[in-house]
Structures are given as structure tokens and as C-alpha cells.
Amino acid sequence: MDNKKLLTTKEVALTLDVSQSTVRRWADSGYLPCYRVGESKYRKFDIDDIEKVKLKIYSKDSSANKEYINKKRVVIKKDIPPLPHPAHYLMHRYWGRKAHNVVSEYIKNFTSEGDIVLDPFMGSGVTNIESSKLNRRSVGIDLNPMSVFIVKSTISNVDIDTFNKYFNSIFNELYDKFHNLYDTKCPECGNTCETEIYVWEEDFIKKVRGKCKEHGLFIKDVDDFDLSRIVQYKELFNELKMTGVLEYPTDPIMQYVKRSGRERIDELFTERALIMLSSLRKQILNIEDENIRNLLFLCFTSMLPNVSRMIPGDVEKCTYKSGWVISKFWTPTVHTERNIFTCFKLRFKTILKGKLELASIDSSLANIYNMDSSNLFNIESNSIDYIFTDPPYGESIAYFALSHFWNCWLDFNVDYSSEMIIDSYRRKDYVDYAFRIKQAFKEMYRVLKPNHYMSFTFHNRDLNIWKAILEGCLDAGFELMGIVLQSQAVSSGTQGINKKNTLTGDFVYNFKKVENNIDKTTYEYMKNAEEFIVNTIKEFLIKKDGATSSELYEYIIPIVAKNHAYCNDDGKVINIESLIKKNFDYIEVIKFDDKGIGEDYKWVVK
């Protein structure tokens, strides 16, 4: 026996991530072959034998798997301070992106290297990307083709020099052809120079911001030259449209996300922007290298909101404000039109920075699929080590309707009928949502290994949605192990519009797949639930001397969930917002702190 290949009990324990007592017990039972070496007769283990056992431990049928996976798998019970998103998560906008370091900590806590992590509602792919960074394999599922496109493009292996070469070629060709569409005149010297920003009021340009090579940045009222340029590009637009050269989507905007009178996707852009975008799209389509083509399309689609009419403007300063801050297609009365050349170059630089950050990532570790999470037919039963996901919140975010803004430019086919959402315009009601989410949790239960964990984040205060989600988990056979209120890295668009009434964090629910529990899960709705909720809130408000909406909901919702206090005595789901308004007062208060006087709102006992 070669002593160089022999490991001590401690070394084996570290290799297999189990205790030394477990190693000794497995050796005594014959599960781990061992050798008595030297006068001391200490146990020694052959490294080849240990590698074979390690493979067994990772396999779904291993008798050791249960004890192995429970080793150090302690449910997280504290808030993890979120960190800002690194560059590779800023490559493309997507809703509900979770703090990468929080997701990473959960993956590290519940898995080991080589394990398989599943996210059946993948979104922007944080779970899959963080899994790859940690040398875990992963499966990402999303019915939205835009989600799949973003994640695959983010993790794809591309030659950076080739990417840079194609970008410059396309950019220069487009610039030579259309740069004059952004021509304006410097108010100081009268020289022709390039416009950076136009500020519109309704359908009329009010201000122009440009840059002169001699006099630098300037702001001016629109003049006759600028008006002549509008006539020029509108004539060009009509000419190209008549000859069939222009190709852009004219799809109707879905009713759920429609706002401010725009009926079609193309109405969210100026004619000048449509000329540029149509030409740019055609150039990208001609690229043969699929990964390069997709990455340039990622630059293209990530730019679309920034060059649309949805960016609020400031007439006096001739600048733009943060755009698309609400989950609707809204064109403000005063809006901006930005220079597409500038925006395309900025998006290229952002995406290049993100790709450089992920240069060492092994893209083969992540398997990404465009499919329905309620039918995971391509995943074997009991094969997944851990699930971390962020399920759709009923009607909170219309992912598919909003992604239509991008999907239609890329000609993606979308299965709207299978979307998990509440949308009365599409006859997608609560019953449909609850049924689909329940089927998804059944599939998650099926593919997860016994005694392994599922974590999901949730951010909603409608008890109907909580009831559908949590009962879907329990009916599938999962056992609730704990709830954590997790701070968010950044506020959502909804929070930005309505800060005083929204939750500031996400709940992270941790469930365990208990073997043979699928037919044993029982629960009863609490009787006198409304009285229970009111009394619980009253005690909380008295103790805290009032609470904000966020503090109140973040306190009461987990209590309601744990006690199944969803329904009133008539069996109807409680409208918790109405119940709170009926029994408590919402008052404006003045706060004094080191920054001076500030206003706040809080709930108090009547």
C-alpha cells in the first residue's frame, strides 16, 4: 500500500464534509474501506476508495446522502446585508433581481461543490450565475424567452477582441449613414455639431443639448435648423417605410401595461429612433457567430428603454431623469430623446465590463431552458440538491407583457397562456394562478432530493397570493423550516413611486422536502382569524408606539402564514389592507434627526 495515497480520519472527514465520528462509524460498518497501519494501528484510508464513496454521496440513491446533506445545513435565520450589483448584473434591465451576495450565501449554506442547484423561475439568472461562481452545477428554467436570452448571453464564452471588432464595424457603418440625423448648430459659432439630448413636450421639441468641438456643451431652444432636421428624418422615414426597408415591431401594447395613450410598441419611439434601430437590428442579424450576434443584441435590447419616449425630461436643464421607473409603458408629457450612437456605445462599454468580470466563469456548469416550470419533464426525480427561486407574485409584475418590449424586436415566440399571473384582461384569474403555482411546487418537490432544501423570496402583501404560494408548498409535501426578512439591495420601481406604502424587504421562506410527506401534510384555517390579526397588530403597535406600513406588514404576514389565518369566518380570504384601515389610524408624523425635519407616516392604535 502506497502511504502517499493514504488519508487520515480527519482528512477524510474534510474531503467528504462529514464529522470524524461519522467517518469512523462508516469504517466500522464497512461502508468506508480502511486499513490499520503501523504499530499504532490507526485507521488509514485509500484516496481512490474515498473518491468512489464521494461519488456515491453525490448520487441521488446514496444511503449516506441523507446524513451528508444534513451536515451543516442549518437554516439561515438572519438578514444578510445586501451588496450593490456588480457590472455583470447591470448588463441588462430585469425586474426583481436579488442581491447576488445574498443568493450566494444561501447556495453556499445549503450545497457543496458539484451539487446541482435549480431555479425554476430564473429571471435574470442570479441563482445560476452565482452557482457557477461557486463551482456548482445549475439548472435555470423560465417560460419567458427574454429571460433565457439574457442569461445565456451573460454567461456565454466570447472572444472579447472579436466582440469589440464587430461592435466597431457596425457602429461606424451606422454612424456614416445616419449621423446627420442628429445634426444641430452651435449657438455661439454656428458650426454644425452633434445633438446629445432633445427634450419634447407632447409631440413638439422644446430644447436641444449639443456639444460643439470649439465651445463645448450647450443648451438652446429649438431653432429653424432643428425643425428642418425633423422634416428631413420624417421624410426619410416615410420613404424607407414605403420601400419596405424599415423593419420594426408594430405589435399592440398589452392592456395590462398600457398607459398614456400609446397603442403600439413602435409608438414608444420617434421616427428618427425607428430608422436607426431598424438599420442596427439588420446589421446585427447578419453576423454569423451566434454568441457575438446575441451579445450585440443584448447591447441593442438593453439600450431600447434609454432611446424610447419613456424617459422623463427636464425642459429647463435639458436633461433626462431615470426612465421606466414604473412597470407600465408610460410616455411622460415632457420626455427626452437621446442620441442612439451615444447610448449604444454606453451599453457596449457596460456589457464589455460585465463580460470581463465573468471571463473565468465556466458556462457549461449552467443548463438554461425556455420551458414551463409546472412541467419539469427534463429533470429526473430526486436529482436536485437545492432550489433557490423567486416565484411570480400574482399581479405584482407583468413580466411577459413588459418583456414584450424586447421580445418583439427579437421575434421571440412567447407562451402567454401558460404565464403564472393574475391579469383580468387575459382571463388570467386567481384560480388559474393558484393552480399553476401549485403544479410548479409539485414539480419542485418531485425533482428535489429527500431531506434537501428549497428557499424562495417573496414580496407581496395580498393574502390571496400568500395563501396560493404557501399552500402550494405544503400541499406538495414541503415542510416550512423558517422565515427571514431580507433587506433589498435596491428599491423596486413600485417602491420608487409609492415609498410610504410598500414593503422594503423580501421574505425568504426555507422549506425542506420531507420524505413520503406528500400525503401527510394537513392544516386547518384558524378560527376567528380577523380578531387574531387585529389583536396581534394592536399589541405590536402599542409596543412600538406605531409602525410604518413596511414594518407592520413585515411583522404580521409571517404570523398570518404560520397560523393559517388567511380566511374570515365566512371562508373568504381576508383583505388585510381593509382590515388594517378599519381598525387602525394612519397618521403623518414629523421626525427630527441630524438631517433636520422630515415627514413620515405610521399606523397607530385608534
Where are these regions (language model features)?
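Nucleic-acid modification enzymes, centered on SAM-dependent nucleic-acid methyltransferases
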Residues: 68-118, 134-380, 399-426, 440, ...
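Short helix-start
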Residues: 10, 33-58
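A short acidic, leucine-rich amphipathic alpha-helix
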Residues: 549-557
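Charged low-complexity interaction tracts in eukaryotic proteins
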Residues: 523-526, 567-606
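Major-groove DNA-recognition helix of helix-turn-helix-type DNA-binding domains
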Residues: 17-42
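Class I SAM-dependent methyltransferase "Motif I" SAM/SAH-binding loop
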Residues: 121-125
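Mobile active-site "lid"/loop adjacent to the S-adenosyl-L-methionine
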Residues: 392-443, 451, 455, 459-464, ...
